[in-house]
Amino acid sequence: GDSRFEPLVEGWVAAARERLRAEFPALSHTALPGREPGRVRGSSLALMSRMLVEVDRQFARAQYDLLREHFVDYRLGVPGIREYHKVTWGGGDVDSGPLFLGYSGPAVVVGAAAARVHGDERLADILLGGTELVGVPLEWLGRRRYAGGLVPVGDAFIAWTRSSPMGSSEPWAPLLPQGWSIPFHLFSAVIALFLAWRGGWLDPVRRSRWGQPD
């Protein structure tokens, strides 16, 4: 980087470190002059874990370790990154977006980028796989859009995540149990069968009538 900005960067990192809580040394979601640091949240911690790599890899790694330990979760067969610490709860807002099972969409997408730059390839693939499943991607004229293209900033973030450089692979401890995806697929199959039953697709008599003229 440009050496002219090194004193500025070093000063910012030092000031940020001074404001970390001793009991949970993660960067807070908000910081206002003269006030105590705000709550730590998954979306902002994921972003800091990704962006700090550009200025201080050691600090970035410490933040990513906290993200991985306290915010990556597995609920009802669905992996993701919680917006709030596992022992707390809160609602969604403009930063986190709507929460699903406590997960924040931005936290999951940006968390995948953080996982990539820290060499946590398996977790990055799992989180990106979740975006493929939930985002319902559609390809049209050589372009891929998620959620029907209704949230273009989401498309941009996913593209940014996929283009984040993969760090040197490390033997990260697995966070999810073996066969972690089985409950989700079973649940999806039950929902699909229920919808098929409600729609009459499982009734051979009703299916045969659909093909007959009135």
Give residue spans per PLM region.
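Extended ligand-binding clefts on enzyme/binding-domain cores
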Residues: 1-106
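CBM-like carbohydrate-recognition segments
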Residues: 60-211
